[in-house]
Amino acid sequence: SLGSRGLGDVYKRQVESESELKNIINLSKNKKTVVNVGIRLNPNVNAQTIGKISTGRMQDKFGLTFKDAIKIIDKYKNSNSIRFKCLSVHIGSQILSNVPYQKMIRVVNNFLEKVSVNFEYVDFGGGMGIDYSSNKKTFDFKKLALEIYKFSKRNECKIILEPGRSIIGDTAVLISKVIYIKESPTKDFIILDAGMNDLIRPALYNAKHMIIPAIKSSKKSKKEYDFVGPICETSDRFLKMKKFQKLNEGEIVILKDVGAYGYVLSSNYNVRPMPKEVLVDKSKTQIISKRQSIKDLI
C-alpha cells in the first residue's frame, strides 16, 4: 500500500482516479515530500484482442476518461505536493494490429493539445503481440515506429514503450509428460503432468499454446487429441489438436511460447509444487528455480 512504502523511492506514482490522487497528496503532505505523478488516460480504443486483456475501452476499469483527466489536472496542477510528470496509456495485451495504436496515438495527440501542463514523458504502454499459432501473423513494429516518429516530431517529450511479451514470449517452453491416455469414442484425452496451475493462460483467457512432441514420429493419431491437466477443474485443459502424431504414456510433449505470463502466473493450486525452471544458453544449462517439494508447501 502507499502508506507502507516511501513515496520518494519510485520514479512516479500512477494515478487512475481522483481518489488515488487525493490519497497521494495527503501522504505527501504528511511526509513533507513532492511526488511525481503519472496520469493514466483511457483513450476508449478497442485493442482488437481478448476481452479479458483489453484495457483501453470505456467499459474497462483502467484510466481516466479524456474529460475527467483534463478536469483533475486543472484542479490539482498547482498543488505543492505533486508534479504531473507523465501521461500513460495502455490499451491491452497480445495486440497484432497497428490500427488500435494509430487510434490511441491520435487520442493522445488531441489530449496533449488541450491539457494545461507539459508532461516530461508519455508512456504508450505495451501489448505488442506474438504469434501463438502457426499462421505466422506477427506484429509490424516498423509501422508502429513510424507512428511514434511522427508523434515525436509533434511533441517535445520523452517516449516510453513496454514491449515485454514481444521480447520474451517465445523464449520459454513448458515440458510435460503424458501420464495417462483416456480413450473415448470421438477423441482421446491426453492427460499431462502439467496443469492449469503451471500455465493458467488457456483456462483464464482461452489462450492457445501450440503443442509439439519432443520426439517426432510419422505415425498419426486417428482421433482428435484433447490435451488436459490432472487438476479437478474442467477448465484444466490446454489445447485440442487433430492429426497429431500418435502418443504413448510416458512420452514428452512441449507447450510453446510460455515466456510471458507463464511462470509468473503459476501457483500452488491443488497443492501442486511449482515446476523447476532451467535456463538454456546454447549448450549450457542452469537451474534458476528449483522444483518445490510438498514439504516446501507445508
Task: Describe each PLM feature range.
Residues 12-19:
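Catalytic beta/alpha-barrel core
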